[in-house]
Amino acid sequence: MLMPKRTKFRKQQKGQFAGLSKGATFVDFGEFGMQTLERGWVTSRQIEACRVAINRYLKRKGKVWIRVFPDKSVTKKPAETRMGKGKGAPDHWVAVVRPGRILFEVANVSREDAQDALRRAAAKLGIRTRFVKRVERV
């Protein structure tokens, strides 16, 4: 699982989802990528499941880049606990994604293989995504 080595504070507030992605909106490293169409949280388990799905489909061909990192802690209170008594303990880590964010990039494979691999990975996520290819920027 991906998680930060250390953070300044153990617990975080929920934050806002408004707006579009501020960065990582273009395919910069590979030839093809997976871009988000919705906003939401992507957990470290979902990122790992996507990585495994892509690598299993490509069978050591090509190269994969993960463009998101789960740096936000999500807390959870124990089961059957009454309300109040403070915020729960950190439970898992998520990456906040907004529309336009590139999640994964793939290189050195055919378009069909990249599309199939990223489609399998997209099935592991709880948000809508689309397949994009690299465009030359000036």
Curated annotation (Swiss-Prot):
InterPro entries: Ribosomal_uL16, Ribosomal_uL16_bact-type, Ribosomal_uL16_CS, Ribosomal_uL16_dom, Ribosomal_uL16_sf. Pfam families: Ribosomal_L16 (PF00252). One of its GO terms (molecular function) is structural constituent of ribosome. Keywords: Ribonucleoprotein, Ribosomal protein, RNA-binding, rRNA-binding, tRNA-binding. PANTHER family: 50S/60S RIBOSOMAL PROTEIN L16, LARGE RIBOSOMAL SUBUNIT PROTEIN UL16M. Belongs to the universal ribosomal protein uL16 family. This is Large ribosomal subunit protein uL16. The lineage of its organism: Bacteria, Pseudomonadati, Chlamydiota, Chlamydiia, Chlamydiales. The gene is rplP.
